[in-house]
Amino acid sequence: MIDKVYCADVKPEMEGKRVKLAGWVYRKREVGKKVFIVLRDSSGIVQVVFSKELNEEAYREAKKLGIESSVIIEGTVKADPRAPTGAEVQADKLQVIQNVDFFPITKDASPEFLLDVRHLHLRSPKVASIMKVKGTLMQAAREWLLQDGWYEVFPPILVTGAVEGGSTLFKLKYFDKTAYLSQSAQLYLEAAIFGLEKVWSLTPSFRAEKSRTRRHLTEFWHLELEAAWMDLWDIMKVEEELVSYMVQRTLELRRSEIETFRKDLTTLKNAVPPFPRISYDEAIDILQSKGVEIEWGEDMGADEERVLTEEFEAPFFVYGYPKHIKAFYMKEDPEDPRKVLAADMLAPEGYGEIIGGSQREDNYDKLIQRILEEGMDPKDYEWYLDLRKYGSVPHSGFGLGLERLVAWVLKLDHVRWATLFPRTPSRLYP
């Protein structure tokens, strides 16, 4: 019995070995009395050659194959430097699982068409590489979090209130009540720290924002951490150590996939602690010196962040934001009541914010005051306020947008390419 091998396992040093391959026809061409097929599977590609002399029946069947036909092939490995992997398989057996007459995706397909047929586009080797990198980033995150003593928890997706502002909630009927899709697991993670101290979760988060920028999705994967006994500076240290490990480990394991998208790895290699830190005040000064029209107290959007990232060749922090542009749960800066103890991590090369974090307000009365200042009803947050009544402690946390991190690592032009089936204001299908 012949062992099945993956396409990427076929190497020149296997010359003369008989192998079985299963996969899909990625490319096909005919030269004389030979049919050359580039076969793909989840591991990569390999060239397979059918010749009339070796097996006329298999050769005739190979001539009929269309792109994306599924096949099982047997043959002998031959070293050939002209082949994509330095070796090819000279096939003498062909089992056609399904022949495809016409595959709708062509080389000149537009981005919008590729999204329309995303269920078919996923089989592209480039898309597969993106998903491998994304999976490896999370594999690395889990490794680091386990080593550092964090507990994974599993918060709800159906919730009763807002975390990041009521105008961006997706509303739905929950029996005889109103529920919403979660914007963030943060409030629930805060509850979990009183038993587990250091917790994290990976969940989908939903934002009903009609933003059509290259870094917004209405559904995205959210890596969130929350820890008791940590202040802002402690949690920033956690952020940089985690992101650095994720990036360096993925560079180690997925370098070839990354180099498919970017040749210059400088900024990734530079993602080593300590990351640069600048205050919001300094950020405004930098932007104004570059001719950006922005005043102290205004939030920085994608355009402002893009200009700011030109100053750095590694991820960096901006801390000390004005209170009125940040969320109600952030702790007021005791040295400047106009500000909160918050910090964002920005990726270089124009990618901007990938993490938002802060020290949380742990005082019951001050938290109620902030809720009222934001025009919200404390009754909607009774259980959350309870956390400040029974053994409240200093604590901090952050959320990382996984697709944004992937987009920076691979230099993608839009976060929609970093998720399996992107959800945007104009796209819910497939």
Swiss-Prot record:
Entry keyword annotation includes Protein biosynthesis: yes
Chief location of this protein within or outside the cell: cytoplasm
Entry's Gene Ontology BP terms: asparaginyl-tRNA aminoacylation
Pfam families xref list: tRNA-synt_2 (PF00152), tRNA_anti-codon (PF01336)
SUPFAM superfamilies linked to this entry: Class II aaRS and biotin synthetases, Nucleic acid-binding proteins
GO CC entries: cytoplasm
PROSITE patterns named among the record's database cross-references: AA_TRNA_LIGASE_II (PS50862)
EC number: 6.1.1.22
Reactions performed catalytically: tRNA(Asn) + L-asparagine + ATP = L-asparaginyl-tRNA(Asn) + AMP + diphosphate + H(+)
UniProt keywords, alphabetically: Aminoacyl-tRNA synthetase, ATP-binding, Cytoplasm, Ligase, Nucleotide-binding, Protein biosynthesis
MF GO annotations: asparagine-tRNA ligase activity; ATP binding; nucleic acid binding
Subcellular location as annotated: Cytoplasm
Domain of life: Archaea
UniProt similarity note: Belongs to the class-II aminoacyl-tRNA synthetase family.
Name of this protein: Asparagine--tRNA ligase
Organism per entry: Thermococcus gammatolerans (strain DSM 15229 / JCM 11827 / EJ3)
Primary gene name: asnS
